[in-house]
Swiss-Prot record:
SMART domains in alphabetical order: SNc
Principal subcellular localisation of the protein: membrane
Annotated protein name in UniProt: Uncharacterized lipoprotein MG186 homolog
GO CC annotation: plasma membrane
Signal sequence, renumbered to the chain: 1-26
Gene Ontology MF, one: endonuclease activity
Lipid group attachment sites (N-palmitoyl cysteine): 27
Region Disordered, residue ranges: 64-136
Chain residues carrying a lipid of type S-diacylglycerol cysteine: 27
Location(s), subcellular: Cell membrane
Keyword Hydrolase in annotation: yes
Length: 301
């Protein structure tokens, strides 16, 4: 299995600079995972705050938008009531009634969230039954990691794709390890970096090269770091990657019920054995990202 080596054979001193340039670019790329996202005002406007009720499995939490709204309402009402302590008793009663009325107007919105862009091993598939062996072990490890990373009752932010998969809303999940931090963290990046999930692209990855088309797709924000995380876990051979020295065989050992989506190869560097180049699945995310940056630079010039 190949890693991030820049010592590829056949590059002689006399090679033309034009031929060597892409290799030099690849060798100087920073593959360090940076799970810190300073979202723009427009991007933050896409986020919906919610509360984690519990985790169904490693890529599907049960969330509640309404409970988060109620929490904010309660905090605001508490502040308002604190300022009205010197008001008449009947006024306080009115406030209490108003608060009760406002709470009942908030519609319950508890449902499953299918995390966009990743897939963890399955615990159970209705048409195929429960997982066993390594698949079951990795599925449970993924769920446990998710529960520790974002415990029940935590506030999260959902970037919804406004689509549903069965009974689950589809969206990217952001969180903050510290409420005071100014940046957001991606749940998807964290799971992939820890080797508990593979990144899956679908058609969304093809939009990355066009900044205007991909503005509504969370991959336009987290895609590069998702690729860095995938390469880190892949080369470290941790968790889902640890079951065989061959990356593909390792994945097929832990994705038996669902099957391993070949789109994960598009997140790997071309130096890796199962990159999109060797798998014939199309341009890698790194190539698409370079195209994206070139278009942004051209637009800004």
């Amino acid at each position: 299995m190949k890693g991030f080596s820049c010592s590829r054979p056949g590059y002689l001193t006399g090679l033309l600079l034009l031929a060597v340039a892409p290799i030099l670019t690849a060798c100087t790329r920073d593959y360090t995972t940076k799970n810190e996202f300073q979202l723009t005002t427009a991007q933050q406007a896409k986020l919906k705050p919610a509360t984690i009720e519990y985790w169904r499995d490693g890529d599907t939490p049960e969330i509640n938008y309404a409970s988060e709204e109620r929490r904010k309402e309660a905090e605001q009402k508490s502040k308002e009531n604190a300022k009205k302590e010197d008001k008449k008793e009947e006024k306080k009663t009115e406030d209490s009634q108003d608060s009760s009325s406002a709470s009942t107007q908030v519609r319950s919105s508890k449902h499953g969230l299918r995390i966009y862009g990743i897939d963890t091993p399955e615990k159970h598939v209705s048409s195929k039954g429960d997982s066993t062996g390594d698949e079951k072990i990795e599925a449970e490890k993924a769920s446990n990691y998710a529960e520790k990373l974002i415990p029940k009752g935590s506030t999260v932010w959902v970037w919804s794709l406004n689509t549903y998969s069965y009974d689950r809303e589809v969206g990217a999940l952001f969180f903050k390890s510290n409420p005071k931090q100014t940046f957001f963290q991606s749940f998807e990046v964290a799971m992939v970096e820890a080797g508990h999930a593979i990144p899956i692209a679908g058609t969304g990855l093809n939009l990355i090269a066009d900044p205007e088309l991909s503005a509504d797709d969370p991959l336009s924000v987290i895609g590069l770091q998702l690729a860095n995380a995938a390469n880190k876990a892949y080369n470290a051979k941790i968790n889902i990657w640890s079951h065989d020295t061959d990356g593909y065989r390792s994945l097929t050992a832990v994705y038996k019920l669902r099957g391993a989506d070949i789109s994960w190869t598009r997140f790997l560097d071309e130096a890796n054995g199962y990159s999109s180049a060797s798998a014939g699945t199309g341009a890698s995310l790194y190539q698409l990202w370079d195209q994206r940056q070139a278009k942004l630079a051209q637009k800004g010039s």
